[in-house]
Design a protein with these regions (language model features):
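Gly/Gly-Pro-rich "capping" loops immediately C-terminal to redox-active cysteine motifs
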Residues: 56-88, 92-98, 132, 136, ...
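N-terminal secretory signal peptides that target proteins for export/translocation
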Residues: 1-16
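Bacterial N-terminal signal peptides
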Residues: 19-30
């Protein structure tokens, strides 16, 4: 496979994605040895941060920010990955072999990461307003807290990556991703794709005032 030059050349990966890929390859090669040497949870957690951001704020498209996520939620998601009940090959592979104690240790570290800050970019006023109205007409704030900070098994939504929020909601609506007792699929069933786009825009810009018209 060619990397540069000539017909059929493969374009280089963006630096962030390349770093994430190298970290996963490194982990896949060394993880069995590292486990045998009792690799610390801190060392393994560093591999996670290569993709999800050292400060808990993801800079890789469609990869969620972990900062501020409730520990209970993180344990639940890692468990689903470990058991192969969430479809993400990289995460399933990363979670293989983790003990319940490992899951708890990872979750505790994630919960200590700072939540992602509000976007520096002003939201689109129309989409922001439509998204806000949707959160008021649906029980988003009941489960995820009025400030969308998340609690227990409910994830933080505020200031999450917009592209990830949209993908997650589309997956819940289509049934590609399992929720808790089907609640998310039911709540999203009557929403259009434009509704999901507006919701993702509002939540990702939560706490940011729209630019004046």
């Amino acid at each position: 496979m060619t990397i540069t030059g000539g017909p059929g050349a493969v374009p280089p990966l963006p630096p962030a994605r390349l770093g994430c890929l190298l970290a996963l390859i490194f982990a896949a090669i060394l993880l069995p040895v590292a486990r045998a040497d009792a690799q610390s949870a801190d060392e393994r957690f560093t591999v996670c941060l290569a993709c999800h951001g050292a400060d808990g704020q993801s800079r890789i498209p469609a990869t969620p920010s972990l900062g501020g996520q409730p520990a209970f939620f993180v344990v639940a998601q890692l468990f689903l990955f470990r058991e192969g009940r969430r479809d993400n090959p990289a995460m399933v592979a990363s979670a293989q072999g983790l003990t319940n104690s490992d899951l708890t240790a990872f979750a505790d570290r994630v919960a200590k990461l700072p939540p992602p800050p509000p976007s520096e970019e002003a939201p689109d006023a129309a989409r922001f307003t439509r998204g806000r109205r949707l959160t008021l007409s649906h029980p988003c704030g009941v489960c995820h807290n009025p400030d969308f900070s998340g609690r227990e098994q409910m994830p933080r939504l505020a200031n999450q990556r917009e592209d990830y929020l949209l993908k997650a909601m589309r997956d819940y609506k289509s049934g590609a991703r399992l929720g808790y007792g089907g609640a998310m699929s039911q709540e999203l069933a009557g929403l259009s794709d434009q509704d999901l786009i507006d919701l993702a825009h509002y939540l990702s810009h939560f706490g940011v005032a729209p630019a004046p018209r």
